[in-house]
Amino acid sequence: MMTQGAVLGLIREGVFQVVLLVAPVLCTALVVGLIVAIFQAVTSIQEQTLTFVPKMLTILGMIALLGGWMLTMLQNYTVRLFDIIPQLVRSGPV
C-alpha cells in the first residue's frame, strides 16, 4: 500500500545508499586534501593546482577501484525498488 510511511522508507533507503556509495570517495579526497594542505602550509607553497590535481586523481582512482561494487549496490537497490513498486501500486489509492 502506498502510504506516507512506505514512501518515506523508500526515500530513507535511497539516501542511505547514496551516502554509502559516496562516503569512501569523499573520505579519501578529504584525507588527500588535508595532507596537501599541511604540505602547502609547511613549505609555504600557495599553488592552487597543487590541491586540485591530487584530489582529482584520488577520486578517479577510488571510482576505478570501487566502481564494480558501486554498480552492484545500485543494481541491487534498483531491482529491490522494481520488486516493491507492484506491491505499492496494486493496493490502489489511499
Curated annotation (Swiss-Prot):
GO term, biological process aspect, one: protein secretion
GO cellular component: bacterial-type flagellum basal body; plasma membrane
The keyword S-adenosyl-L-methionine is annotated on this UniProt entry: no
Annotated function: Role in flagellar biosynthesis.
Organism: Treponema pallidum (strain Nichols)
Transmembrane segments: 19-39, 50-70
Record family assignment: Belongs to the FliQ/MopD/SpaQ family.
Localization: Cell membrane; Bacterial flagellum basal body
InterPro entries registered for this protein in UniProt: Bac_export_3, FliQ
Membrane topology (UniProt): Multi-pass membrane protein
UniProt keyword annotations, A-Z: Bacterial flagellum, Cell membrane, Membrane, Transmembrane, Transmembrane helix
Protein name, UniProt field: Flagellar biosynthetic protein FliQ
